[in-house]
Amino acid sequence: MISRYKTWLVWLRRCAHSRGFGIQSPIDYEFVRYVVNEHWDYYAYSRLGKEDDWLHRKLGRLYFRITNRLQPTVVESSDYHNYIRAACRNVRFGDSSEFIIIPHERCDRASLDAIYNKVGESSVLVVEGIYESGEAKKRWRDIIADARTGVTFDLYYCGIVFFDKKRYKQHYIVNF
């Protein structure tokens, strides 16, 4: 569990990357500004995550907003089902190529190759805990460097990967 003190230090170190500053691509800026760093209370927030700790609630709300934007039919996730279903009522959970949420422990080479083989240009991958250990950091750097990935966002608590090859490969650090 990350302490509140460390949370503030992370936030201060990343404050230059707040609210999309430095992002030149209009699509990427819009994603950061209106999905990642959206601060409006959505209609479902009042009934979601009351018993969750702050990080689970923060990530759950992020996945809610991503799901609300993407409207996927199938999501691959072992957790956060309430948040995802609140954003998209008809969503199913299982093996997906649209929206995949995995913990860093499941990011071994074989798992990533399987994911890379099934994703398309509109797919989104979220890797949780990208800074939890030295090995997690290395895996995240490998994902960023992989030629099969496109635009990546480092939110400290998780990393978001897009696979659209029509866009320039970019890596953004975002104060989330």
Residue ranges of predicted features:
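A short alpha-helical cap/connector motif
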Residues: M1-E121, Y131-F176
